[in-house]
Amino acid sequence: MNNDHLDPINSLNVPELADTTFAMDFLIRAKEGVRNTAVALTETASPDVRALLRKQLMQGIAMHQEITELMISKKWFHPYELSEQYKLDQLSAKNTIMVGNMNLFPDETNRKGMFDRTPDEH
């Protein structure tokens, strides 16, 4: 692996990794919203607020379903195939370790040789 964190070659496949990460985070947030709305619904006495929360709960469940279906269609999530999901989780863990081991802030970051003058020169 090229250890130069500014080299564009190190960004190969990053958009795909980012998409899966964002989708999983969105799914988790949608699930969290459904859970929090359900708790709020059980603790509300006002009929108007209960109706509003019930509507939000249904919308949250629909959003969760939509995100899940998108992830399944793109093969980013395998809720019914545990061995496939395990492989994805292992790959994710491997990538996390790889990024964690990258020297993202090397001692030498001087890129002065890449430019013919400093920014202050006109």
From Swiss-Prot:
<dbReference type="Pfam" id="PF07875">
    <property type="entry name" value="Coat_F"/>
</dbReference>
<dbReference type="InterPro" id="IPR012347">
    <property type="entry name" value="Ferritin-like"/>
</dbReference>
<dbReference type="GO" id="GO:0030435">
    <property type="term" value="P:sporulation resulting in formation of a cellular spore"/>
</dbReference>
<dbReference type="InterPro" id="IPR012851">
    <property type="entry name" value="Spore_coat_CotF-like"/>
</dbReference>
<protein>
    <recommendedName>
        <fullName>Spore coat protein F-like protein YraF</fullName>
    </recommendedName>
</protein>
<comment type="similarity">
    <text>Belongs to the CotF family.</text>
</comment>
<keyword id="KW-0749">Sporulation</keyword>
